[in-house]
């Protein structure tokens, strides 16, 4: 029996925007842990397409347990100082979605030193609402702390303040040759100090021998305190609600 399903689509068009929420709702009604992973348009694609995309996002939010939104506009910001071809930029957008789904799947399918399983993922993502899934890599001194910082640069964060998450799961990966030392775990303290006092945190340690001297941090955060933006009905959003969503996804980036 299927325990978990990922539903991915690009919002703003016809097929994905209309069909994905329906499919998601059918899966969730069957008790399947349902995770939506969607992309929303670049700002230059225009307000009509963006408005349609955000309405689709809201419909997805109503029909999934957790929703990851990858914003193409954030990719422009992150790579604004690089000479990147459009084709490569679009590939990056696809990569963000792929990495998110793959990282969640690996937590379930791989065996960790400090292990986490489907029940742990379910604890964090069941009825979790808006979600963050990000991955960061680092090596050298303070590598774990730096990996957390890199994870927080993810396009999946949008204008979300991770400090307001009430559920979190993170996994630290390292190779056999360059295992994480107990002393290195102190670096996590500085990250945790900024989180909500009532946050529920699960964590694990896994092996990945492709990393060499690097560590990888995979982070899932859900259940945000102030992100309950909902529509009054299935057809339309109020002007105020539209403004909140526009600011969340297309407003000025909040600096950490």
State each model region's role.
Residues 1-256:
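Tubulin/FtsZ superfamily GTPase core signature
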């Amino acid at each position: 029996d299927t325990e978990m399903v990922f539903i991915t689509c690009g919002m703003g068009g016809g097929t994905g925007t209309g069909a994905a929420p329906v499919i998601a709702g059918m899966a969730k009604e069957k008790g399947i842990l349902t995770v939506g992973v969607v992309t929303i348009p670049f700002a230059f694609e225009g307000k009509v397409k963006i408005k349609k995309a955000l309405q689709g996002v809201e419909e997805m939010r109503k029909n999934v347990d957790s929703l990851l939104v990858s914003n193409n506009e954030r990719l422009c910001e992150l790579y604004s100082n690089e000479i990147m071809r459009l084709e490569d930029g679009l590939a990056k957008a696809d990569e963000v979605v792929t990495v998110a789904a793959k990282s969640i799947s690996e937590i379930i399918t791989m065996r960790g030193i400090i292990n986490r399983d489907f029940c742990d993922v379910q604890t964090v993502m069941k009825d979790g609402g808006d979600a963050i899934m990000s991955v960061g890599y680092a090596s050298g001194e303070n590598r774990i702390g730096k990996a957390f910082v890199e994870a927080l640069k993810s396009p999946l964060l949008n204008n979300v303040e991770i400090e307001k998450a009430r559920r979190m799961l993170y996994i630290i990966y390292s190779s056999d040759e360059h295992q994480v030392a107990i002393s290195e775990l102190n670096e996590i303290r500085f990250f945790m100090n900024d989180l909500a006092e009532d946050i529920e945190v699960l964590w694990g340690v896994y092996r990945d021998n492709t990393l060499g001297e690097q560590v990888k941090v995979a982070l899932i955060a859900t259940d945000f305190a102030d992100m309950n933006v909902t529509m009054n009905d299935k057809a339309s959003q109020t002007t105020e609600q539209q403004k909140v969503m526009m600011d969340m996804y297309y407003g000025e980036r909040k600096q950490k």
